[in-house]
Amino acid sequence: MQKLLLPFLLLAVTIALGQSKYITKSGSMSFEASQPTFEPIEATHSAVSALLNADTGELAVLALVRGFRFPLALMEEHFNENYIESHKYPKTSFKGSILNFDSNALSNQPRTVQLTGELSMHGVTKPISVYATITQSDELITLTSSFSVKTTDFGIEIPSLVRKQINQNVQIEVSLLLQRKQ
């Protein structure tokens, strides 16, 4: 009897631990750095990866920089080669947690939570604290956030020739539809 009980308990623990992880590989992220009266500077990314540990509230988000798509190919080229230097800094990431996270309090009613952690971009890592909205429906957790960062905080230099055309306060929108990991 004990020989049967141990494997069953190990299986139950493994299943329980596996159910606390939520993942996505198709999250979306967009940014906008437009200035009034100039051409819009905006891009979207639809292959953002994220992992949420629903037991602890730990969150990790990763976006490959070359995944951002612009309305114009030339903008995309300038972004990758001149500003963000994606050949040197191929990833942007967030690693942190949801403060006071309680997975039992999640529901289909949107709730505001605070994310704290480190944002890494362009070879620079900075502490960040932003607000997000979280909901849960069946096996899905949706997490959305809107915040801004300064290009100068991450060592992103904008040439003086176009400095007036690009807002140095970049507005970022993130939307993650996280599915329970099986």
Which ranges hold each PLM region?
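Bacterial Sec-dependent N-terminal signal peptides
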Residues: M1-K21
